[in-house]
Amino acid sequence: MASTSVPENYYVVPIGETQMVILKRYENLRLIGSGAQGIVCAATDMVTNKPVAIKKLSRPFQNVTHAKRAYREFILMNLVNHKNIIGLLNAFSPQREVEEFNDLYIVMELMDANLCQVIQMDLDHERLSYLLYQMLCGIKHLHSAGIIHRDLKPSNIVVKSDCTLKILDFGLARTAVEAFMMTPYVVTRYYRAPEVILGMGYGENVDVWSVGCIFGELIRGRVLFPGADHIDQWTRIIELLGTPEPQFLARLQTTVRNYVENRQKYQPVPFETLFADNMFPPGADNARLTAAKARDLLSRMLVIDPEKRISVDDALAHEYVNVWYDASRGSCSSAGPSTILLVDGEHTVEEWRAMLFAELQNYYRTHDVYGVGQRR
C-alpha cells in the first residue's frame, strides 16, 4: 500500500514479506507466529502501555471458506467473555469502504507460549491438573453458549508463565444445532474425534476427545495418534484403544461399517501401559493428584463411542481436576450470552464480506478503537 493511501491514524510496518497497516496506537511490532490463517505480531499498546498480540487474517476473502471463517472468528471473539477464552481487545481495518475491504486485524491479550512449547516441559501434577481444569472451563463456557470449538489442538491453547490458560481460534467453531449430522470438517487430524473420522453426526463431546488427546500428549510428551492420513488416523486410534463394540459399529453408514468391520481387529492397550507411572511426575501434596487419578480421567475421555465418553461437566467433577473448583466464587461459571446465534447458510464471498464489514462498523461505533476517547 503506498504511503499516500494510508489512512489517518495508521502507518505501515513491513513484517517479512507482509505489509501490516497498523493503528498508530500500536508500536514495537515483532513477528511471533505465522500460518495458513494469518500472521501474529507482538506489539505495545501505547494507550494502555500493555503488551498485545495483533493477528492479521490471511486473505480473508480469498474464497467462501476463508470468508466464513473470518466472520465466525470475529463474531465469537467479540461475544464470548470468559477468563479461559482469549478475548478481543480491539479490531480494525484500514479500508473504509466495503468494496475495498480486504484486511482484518484482531488485537488480543499477549500470552507467553502455546501448549506446543509446554509439552516439552516437565510439569508437576498441580500444573497438569490446573491446565486441564482451565481447558475444561473454557470449553464448558463455549458449550453453554451453544458453541462447539471443533479445532482444539496445542497450538490453539495459550498460556502465561503463571500457568493461566486461554483457548483461541474460533474460525471453525459451530453451533450445536449446526453440528448435528454435519459432514466431516477440515481440522488438525491428530485431535480429530472418531465420530468425525467415520462421518457420523457429532456433538459437544468432539471437544472432550480433543482435550483428552492434548492431556495425553502433555503426559507422554508426544502426539497420541499421529495418523499419516484419514485411514491411518483411525488405525492409530484402534491400535491403542481397541476395535469398538458391535453396538457402535451398527450406528455407522453401511459402507463405512463394512470397511471398519473388515479391518484388522485390535484389543485395547491397558491405560496402565499407555500412561505408565514413570511418565508422570512424582506424587503431589494433594492425595487426589496422582497418576492413577489422571489415568482414570484419561480413560473416560479417550472413548471411541461418544455416547460413552465423559461429558465436560462430569470431567470437571472428576477428582483429578475438581480440586481447583471454588463453588463460592463460581470459578468455572459461564456468565455471558446464553446462546450465540451465528449467521450460516450459503453465502457468496461478497455477502460474507458485507456482513463482516457491517459487524466491524458496529464495533467501531461502540468501542474506542483509536484509544483517544472517541468512536470511529
From Swiss-Prot:
ATP binds at residues 33-38, 55. Responds to activation by environmental stress and pro-inflammatory cytokines by phosphorylating a number of transcription factors, and thus regulates transcriptional activity. This is Stress-activated protein kinase JNK-1. Signal peptide: none annotated. It comes from the Eukaryota. The active site is at residue 151. InterPro entries: Kinase-like_dom_sf, MAP_kinase, MAP_kinase_CS, MAPK_JNK, Prot_kinase_dom, Ser/Thr_kinase_AS. Activated by threonine and tyrosine phosphorylation. GO terms for biological process: JNK cascade. The modification Phosphotyrosine is found at residue 185. Its EC number is 2.7.11.24. The gene is JNK-1.
